[in-house]
Amino acid sequence: MAEAERIIGTPDIPDAAGEGQERPDADPEREQQEQEQAPERTRGKRRVAVLFAVALFAYLLDLGSKMLVVAKLEHHEPIEIIGDWLRFAAIRNAGAAFGFGEAFTIIFTVIAAAVIVVIARLARKLHSLPWAIALGLLLGGALGNLTDRIFRAPGVFEGAVVDFIAPKHFAVFNLADSAIVCGGILIVILSFRGLDPDGTVHKD
């Protein structure tokens, strides 16, 4: 009798080994959905890591090149790389990429900051490797020029960007500008191909 009462009074709960009946609040469909989404979340995290790795590489390359140019080229004669066709010459640019809009330094600073915020928001839904590379180039380039605008003379948010790559019959630019242009071109190509940042493909 005591044995029967003990059996009847024992609740159906998992034992120490994790065995027993299923929890009343368990949702098999939800658990299956979470298991299916787990690889997708992992892939998304990897794409975000690629984005920031590309951005960091572009940013450090731009920053290092500018520091070297300021130390070795500023107030010195330009260095000819390919005759007159390509030279390195230190130029302070208060405008946008390739020397455009020098009277709107603060506006371009705000635009660069807005681009960084937009990229950070897109990163949350990023599942495409090409998009990760493109956005990483944009982010690294925007950060590179924004750093100049914040920390260089004549003042905060009005600083002049250091440009030094001077092709013949073309505007002087820097590596941050190159990263921004390459990232923009890649985004245009991806958009024409119908590939979205979340990895979905649209075919017309």
UniProtKB/Swiss-Prot annotation:
Location, primary (coarse class): membrane
Membrane topology: Multi-pass membrane protein
Entry's EC annotation: 3.4.23.36
Species lineage: Bacteria, Bacillati, Actinomycetota, Actinomycetes, Kitasatosporales
Name of the protein in question: Lipoprotein signal peptidase
GO biological process, one term: proteolysis
Similarity comment: Belongs to the peptidase A8 family.
Annotated catalysed reactions: Release of signal peptides from bacterial membrane prolipoproteins. Hydrolyzes -Xaa-Yaa-Zaa-|-(S,diacylglyceryl)Cys-, in which Xaa is hydrophobic (preferably Leu), and Yaa (Ala or Ser) and Zaa (Gly or Ala) have small, neutral side chains
Transmembrane regions: 50-70, 100-120, 126-146, 170-190
Gene label: lspA
Record organism: Streptomyces coelicolor (strain ATCC BAA-471 / A3(2) / M145)
Pathways involved: Protein modification; lipoprotein biosynthesis (signal peptide cleavage)
PROSITE patterns, sorted: SPASE_II (PS00855)
Enzyme class: hydrolase
Function in brief: This protein specifically catalyzes the removal of signal peptides from prolipoproteins.
